[in-house]
Structures are given as structure tokens and as C-alpha cells.
Design a protein with these regions (language model features):
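N-terminal core-binding DNA-recognition domain of tyrosine recombinases/integrases
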Residues: 3-106, 122-125, 199
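DNA breakage-rejoining catalytic core of tyrosine-based enzymes
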Residues: 87-90, 101-117, 172-182, 197-202, ...
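Catalytic-site neighborhood detector that most strongly recognizes the C-terminal catalytic loop/helix
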Residues: 109, 169, 264, 268-289
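Basic, Lys/Arg- and aromatic-enriched nucleic-acid-binding interface segment
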Residues: 117-147
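Short, basic (Lys/Arg/His-rich) helix/loop patches that form interaction surfaces
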Residues: 123-127, 178, 222-262
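Conserved tyrosine-mediated DNA breakage-rejoining catalytic core shared by Y-recombinases
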Residues: 143, 148, 152-186
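Active-site/catalytic core of tyrosine-dependent DNA strand-transfer enzymes
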Residues: 182-234
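C-terminal secondary-structure termini that scaffold catalytic or DNA-interacting sites
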Residues: 291-301
Length: 301
């Protein structure tokens, strides 16, 4: 088990998975292997669909999310075992019983009224922390950058003459160059001139009090909450809503899937497809009348 788990985790490291994610992978794979050992298995080649199904039945989690997460990991591990010929049977990953049909969640985005309030906040607030807050939130809403990438912004990442931001995204290691809207540039400039402490740091956003330096944690989320307090009461209502809002607005402005992928730094189009649900205008064009399909509606209300 140790050799297989180590190889599997090394593969995930090469895919730039975070430490916390790797710990979850290790825990789930170890739990699966211990289950096999407890049931008398000392070789992956002996694994059968029946024992996989038994594992899925006995797995106990207090939440469906925890159970689903473990199954996603174990499925990936089973595919790894198949790929590297630890097992003799193919398709064992399909033997795990999910226990529930997939559900499409409603995408949470900022409303037009909330976007307007962000703009109004910018015009009426000018303390150092408020200037930092508005620059951070506008970067999220207008460029779609993740919180970790915003806090990692350095002076050399911004080309003021070309109005561009160029970074290597922390999550995907993708190099990306984005246009910097004028209002974003103005907000950053106002923060640098009137709000940022005179700190010897390469990072644009620094703490407002000594010791000055790069900020971490929930700084971006707290900035959003100070501007839109009601977001604090939204389940899962963190800073990532600004990225979803940015992607949705691109789609509403008739950007194509490839353009949105480039703007977000995504490699997989499936991660962008969920935003199509919010494009009411183009979704209506997909509808077909019953006459076109050859079906006739009889009777009435």
C-alpha cells in the first residue's frame, strides 16, 4: 500500500495540489487500504467489484459532502492502480456507490445593486484601510483574480503604461496577462498614494500597522464584508463570489467560452460551463417550440 499511495501522492503533487488537499488524499487512501487489509487482502490484484461495493456501504461520514469527497479520492486512487497495473481488473473505480444523484447548485454572484454600492463606497470612503479594501474588491470584481493572487501582487506585476497585470496564478501555475480597467488602476493608485504605509516591501498590499508586510488569511473576504455587510450572512459567501461575478459578466457581455477560460486562467472548459446557467438571454435562444420537435400539445388549462 505504501508504495502505491506514495506514487499516487507524487502524481498529485505534480498537478500542483495544495498541502491540505494532499493530506485529504493520503487519509482517504490509507483508510481504503486499511479496510482491504482488515478484510484479508494483501495484494491489489485480488480486489474485486464486490469488496469495492462493500467499502462504499460501510464507509461512515457525518455529512454527504465528506462521503462524496472520500469517494472522489478513492476513485482517483483506483484509476491510478489500474493505470500502473497494480490491479488486474479494469473499471473498479465505477463500483463505488455514490448514494445520491448529482445536483446543480445555483451560482452565487453579486447583484447589480451590490456592484453599484461598491462604486458608491469608493466615492465616499478614503481612510487607508478603506482605500485598500476598495482596491482589493475591485480587483476581484473587474479582473476575476483569486484572493491569494491579489495579496501576492507585486509592483513589477503591473505595467502602468500598457494597463496590464501579469502574474503566475498560485493555484494552477498558469501565467496570465490581464487588462487592468481604468477604475481598478485608479483604485490601486489611490491606495498607493494615500493609504499604503511607507513600507519597504515588494508587495502592493501590506498591513496597515507595523510590522508591515504581505497580508494573509481572510483579508480579502473581510474587505468585501466591510463594503457589503450582508455577505457575511451568506453561506459560503467568501471573496470567491467576485470571481464568479466577473465570469458571469463576461458571459453576459457575449464573451465566448475560450475567452472566459483565458481570462480566468482555466484549462478545463467544464469549470466554466456552470456559468452558462446565468446567461438568461442566450439560454432563451436554446429553447425549442413543440412544433419544431414534432410534438403537439393537445388540450388546455
Amino acid at each position: 500500500c505504501k508504495e502505491a499511495i506514495t506514487g499516487f501522492l507524487e502524481q498529485k503533487k505534480r498537478e500542483y495540489r495544495k498541502r491540505g488537499t494532499l493530506r485529504s488524499y493520503r487519509c482517504s487512501c490509507t483508510s481504503f487500504c486499511l479496510f482491504l487489509i482488515d478484510h484479508g487482502y494483501d495484494n491489489f490484484k485480488l480486489i474485486s467489484p464486490e469488496i469495492i461495493k462493500e467499502f462504499s456501504i460501510q464507509d461512515k461520514h457525518s455529512t454527504f459532502k465528506g462521503r462524496a469527497t472520500r469517494f472522489v479520492i478513492v476513485r482517483a486512487f483506483l484509476r491510478y492502480l489500474d493505470e500502473y497495473r497494480y490491479t488486474e481488473r479494469h473499471g473498479l473505480d465505477q463500483c463505488l456507490i455514490s448514494g445520491s444523484a448529482p445536483v446543480d447548485k445555483i451560482i452565487d454572484v453579486l447583484s447589480d445593486e451590490q456592484i453599484q454600492r461598491i462604486q458608491e463606497y469608493r466615492m465616499t470612503h478614503n481612510t487607508p484601510v478603506e482605500l485598500r479594501d476598495i482596491a482589493i474588491v475591485l480587483l476581484g470584481v473587474k479582473t476575476g483574480l483569486r484572493a491569494c493572487d491579489i495579496l501576492a501582487l507585486r509592483f513589477q506585476d503591473i505595467d502602468w503604461k500598457k494597463c496590464q497585470i501579469s502574474i503566475i496564478m498560485k493555484k494552477t501555475k498558469t501565467q496570465i496577462t490581464l487588462p487592468m480597467p481604468v477604475e481598478v488602476g485608479n483604485a490601486i493608485y489611490s491606495y498607493l498614494k494615500y493609504g499604503r504605509p511607507d513600507a519597504e516591501s515588494d508587495f502592493i498590499f501590506v498591513r496597515s500597522k507595523a510590522p508591515y508586510g504581505k497580508m494573509t488569511g481572510k483579508v480579502c473576504t473581510r474587505a468585501l464584508y466591510r463594503i457589503l455587510p450582508e455577505r457575511n450572512n451568506v453561506k459560503g459567501g467568501g471573496f470567491h463570489v467576485t470571481r464568479r461575478t466577473f465570469a458571469t459578466n463576461l458571459l453576459k457581455n457575449h464573451a465566448g467560452i475560450d475567452e472566459i477560460m483565458d481570462a480566468l486562467g482555466h484549462r478545463d472548459p467544464t469549470s466554466v460551463m456552470k456559468y452558462l446557467l446565468l446567461d438568461d438571454e442566450r439560454s432563451r435562444k436554446c429553447g425549442l417550440s413543440l412544433s419544431v420537435t414534432g410534438l403537439m400539445l393537445e388540450g388546455g388549462l
